[in-house]
Amino acid sequence: RLIEYGEEHPIEILLVDESSRALVGDVKAEQVMVLCDGELVDGPDIFPAIYKYQSGDCIMREVLASYCSRPVEPALALLGSRALVVGIYSPVNRCFKSSLALTIGQVMAKKESVLYLNLEEYSGFTRLINSEYKADLSDVLYLYRQGGYNWMKLKSMISNWGNMDFIPPVRYAEDLSQVAPEDMAQLIDRIARESGYDRLVVDVGQMGRGALPVLSMCNVVYMPVREDYISAAKIEEFEEYLEEADDAGVRDRIQKLRLPRHTGIAKQEGY
């Protein structure tokens, strides 16, 4: 029946177990992958092997990663409108910026498809959700610099937390410093245009004046602020910079937020 189906319908990926491995020779499939139990099997037909005793999300990421290792169309993308890019940024420290970004992402994800992107040097994200990842934003940036980026490859690096999808943050802080702010902005724009998500939430790190190109890609920028004298001085200095840069577009999209102070979250379980 599968052979007949392959004659009439294109099969891009065929995922089989080891017991069916010898039976797929007559099936017309672009790529065959084998679910294995950990032992290497020799044979004339060498198919990519995927360890089957792992979570479904991990299996799916390995399938997509293997599929994307083949040459693909450079312009491969999901059709649809550009995602609304929501930036979370503040020149003020310890203002619950990342808490706000994660909350906005989870709330939006209840009704829309959301992708969360963290651009901080030290996000603490993997410890927050107690998970480790084989691929992260460092790999995305490498692909983009090498000209090998496309949406299918990015999809293999995306994980899920609650209702929200996310790209795991960089492993090493220096990976962010090796990317020009303009290139980062172009990457964000490309993800927004090609990913098929409704919303792209970007937690913008302390990029100095390099944050401006990234903020320019955002449809709206939420800026948590504090009312103490030092924080107010930082906000005023940032606004003066926007005036000097003559970037009314970014200035008009900024919405300042004064968040309630909370001290009850002391452990990762609180999130």
Which residue stretches match the model-derived regions?
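Extreme N-terminal, non-catalytic leader segments
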Residues: 16, 23, 27-85
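P-loop/Walker-type NTP enzyme "switch/lid" segment
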Residues: 119-193
